[in-house]
Amino acid sequence: MNRFLRRLGVVGDIKNKGERVAEASANSKLIVIVEDDTRIADVFAEMLTRAGRWRLHFIADGQVARDQLPDLGADLILLDVGLPSLDGASLYRILRGHNKTRNTPIVVITASHEWELHRMGLQTGLLLRKPFKFQELLDIIHALLPEE
């Protein structure tokens, strides 16, 4: 378990990976978290719910994300690299090539030291390496989704 999870602990399992709305209105910004590890998804859900008034939508599979993301209208995508059925690097390239998602901010989250992933993240300016402090993620989110 990485430093991030040890520090935060792990909250209950997310059974339904669909949309979670916590004190968020229908016009709140939508953050889509593409993460297959339920423990990490649970931590994201808990911490992002406490930290802001965003709508959260979880997708645990790369192919499902490829099919759903263009029509979700996400304001921000948090994209794990290690996904089943379609890896995050391939999904990233697909999303950047799609007219509905090409301008959506994507934060690439990885523990990998692979250069291609870092280059991909550096092109967007939005690469977050595990382990990270949750405040780092919040700072990125607040910069990309300023409150109105």
Regions found by a protein language model. Give the residues of each.
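Conserved acidic carboxylate
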Residues: 35
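Non-catalytic signal-transmission and effector/linker regions of two-component phosphorelay proteins
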Residues: 1-32, 133-148
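Acidic catalytic/metal-coordinating carboxylates
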Residues: 61, 87-93
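Acidic, metal-coordinating helix/loop segments flanking the phosphotransfer/catalytic sites
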Residues: 58-76
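The feature encodes the CheY-like receiver
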Residues: 84, 102
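Alpha4 helix (beta4-alpha4-beta5 surface) of REC/receiver domains from two-component response regulators
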Residues: 45, 90, 112-129, 135, ...
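Two-component/phosphorelay signaling modules centered on CheY-like receiver
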Residues: 38-57, 64
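Active-site residues of response regulator receiver
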Residues: 80
